């Protein structure tokens, strides 16, 4: 079967890149939008898996199979979690992207380019210090950080020598959480990216003068490094439908959405455009709405909340309110379903149109699945997807549910007023989304907000917290009100993010005791997973 790429793209718009394509032509988001935008999100993830990417690829295949023009947009996987604990991010079963081993491990080198450009900025800043140039950069007032696309906890806190008499305390972020990745994904075009990176605050001088990237005189070098990376990539599903894959910020420590450049391309090409926001709706979807939609004036016509029977039972069993182990399967579903209700209400409070897709596992118990379907149908329109096992031809009900659920978007009820002060915005996010009761701040967080108050008046809030619970605590599986403590504050001036860091959340992940890197086996004759 040949791929459907030329159904949507002219050959002159594309350039071959190994087994993939890059889109050379730049697109703007249409002023009169005719495409329908569908956002795919989920409940809080569990070790059982939710299949959000699988569901997105499945819906895209379904829409194409039954005669609609549809393109999906996805984030590029990071090698950090791929070699860490999470593994790849290319779907599975009959909803897996072609060439997953290539996509998961380096792909078209976009992450390397972002990493190199990001680190060039830091290297030049320190070079200015080494040669004591006229910029007179204060070594203790550098805002920018290095990044690398590998989980490495030893890089969370480092001390190193810049010159004979100057040492610096700093840290690395993982590339997916870097300042440059966020800008890469929110920029509307190459020219927009160039303008915004030039005017990004990176340090202060010894006389407290602001130092911007343009002061370093390296903007042409940055754009040279990122020339190919800023072109979105095309990959294909098993049904040979095109998927635009571009950018890859994490949702728990960044904003968790693929690039605006990719969305712009899709919205110019197809009747339906699907996109995914990372982790549960309290992270990726919230940031998609409060950050990306504000940046682009887009509003999704439909939000798909992905759930699974296994995940809901996991949330039920691990609910912190349980006084004794649960043995009744329906009771596990009843208690775990509170997580679904929480995410559904969060999305409805934003004034979004929501349907639920139950991603069916092949070994799910039919009676339990029917029980879950009935509970979910009391909330909103619900459908069971068997895309993983059966593919598009046997999922007409999924196609029909998606088509019937798409509506004209309504005005968004924003979580916070962008013009409000930083503390009020963080408090609104904490109470309305994370179920916070009392919000407190460490002395460090308070001091950073005070020091930056003149710079962050119209900044977005991009929370950094655990993805495994609606709250800020890993072990907290229920949805009760709880106290929230802001440990630290990071500022990303490239995209105007205030990043409140809750509990023990790190911008550089670590590896587990037995990382996934030890488990990967490759047949080198065919370069395929064993």
From Swiss-Prot:
<dbReference type="GO" id="GO:0004329">
    <property type="term" value="F:formate-tetrahydrofolate ligase activity"/>
</dbReference>
<dbReference type="InterPro" id="IPR027417">
    <property type="entry name" value="P-loop_NTPase"/>
</dbReference>
<dbReference type="GO" id="GO:0035999">
    <property type="term" value="P:tetrahydrofolate interconversion"/>
</dbReference>
<keyword id="KW-0436">Ligase</keyword>
<comment type="similarity">
    <text>Belongs to the formate--tetrahydrofolate ligase family.</text>
</comment>
<feature type="binding site">
    <location>
        <begin position="46"/>
        <end position="53"/>
    </location>
    <ligand>
        <name>ATP</name>
    </ligand>
</feature>
<keyword id="KW-0547">Nucleotide-binding</keyword>
<keyword id="KW-0067">ATP-binding</keyword>
<dbReference type="InterPro" id="IPR000559">
    <property type="entry name" value="Formate_THF_ligase"/>
</dbReference>
<dbReference type="GO" id="GO:0005524">
    <property type="term" value="F:ATP binding"/>
</dbReference>
<dbReference type="InterPro" id="IPR020628">
    <property type="entry name" value="Formate_THF_ligase_CS"/>
</dbReference>
<keyword id="KW-0554">One-carbon metabolism</keyword>
<protein>
    <recommendedName>
        <fullName>Formate--tetrahydrofolate ligase</fullName>
        <ecNumber>6.3.4.3</ecNumber>
    </recommendedName>
</protein>
<dbReference type="Pfam" id="PF01268">
    <property type="entry name" value="FTHFS"/>
</dbReference>
<comment type="pathway">
    <text>One-carbon metabolism; tetrahydrofolate interconversion.</text>
</comment>
